[in-house]
């Protein structure tokens, strides 16, 4: 992620994150410490950002290995229901599976109304706080 892309991702996430200082620090860590996680950005045909995912890594005693923590998935309203989010999650699953990561977890609350979206992408409800996808 370049410095310019970092600012674009910040602008995409900032409306839902009141603590802009913490968001800025987290995005800086994603740039400086790729071993901690990564940010993927989805572009449209005009090279405009239409969405992104932020993923960090954690050791899970429940899963018995390393899991990818989907910290955020954001798709611009005009790009929703066009396959951007599904594409991001499917690419994520393929990528982290190749890294021997055993699952993907998210803390996206069920209250956000995304249960059918995550279910269609192979996730199951983990608890009231999120969803999980086991990778074989």
Task: Please describe what each predicted stretch is.
Residues 89, 96-109:
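Conserved GNAT acetyl-CoA-binding A-motif
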Residues 80, 105-115, 132-136:
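Conserved beta-strand-loop-alpha-helix junction that forms the acyl-donor binding cleft
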Residues 118-128:
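Conserved acetyl-CoA-binding loop of GNAT-fold acetyltransferases
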């Amino acid at each position: 992620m370049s410095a310019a892309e970092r600012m674009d991702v910040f602008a995409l996430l900032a409306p839902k994150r009141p603590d802009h200082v913490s968001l800025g620090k987290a995005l800086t860590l994603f740039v400086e410490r790729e071993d901690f996680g990564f940010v993927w950005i989805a572009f449209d045909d005009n090279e405009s950002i239409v969405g992104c995912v932020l993923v960090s890594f954690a050791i899970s005693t429940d899963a018995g290995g390393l899991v990818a923590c989907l910290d955020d998935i954001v798709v611009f309203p005009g790009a929703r229901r066009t396959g951007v989010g599904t594409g991001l999650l499917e690419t994520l699953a393929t990528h982290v599976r190749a890294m021997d990561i055993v699952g993907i977890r998210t803390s996206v609350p069920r209250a956000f109304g995304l249960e059918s979206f995550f279910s269609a992408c192979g996730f199951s409800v983990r608890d009231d706080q999120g969803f999980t996808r086991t990778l074989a």
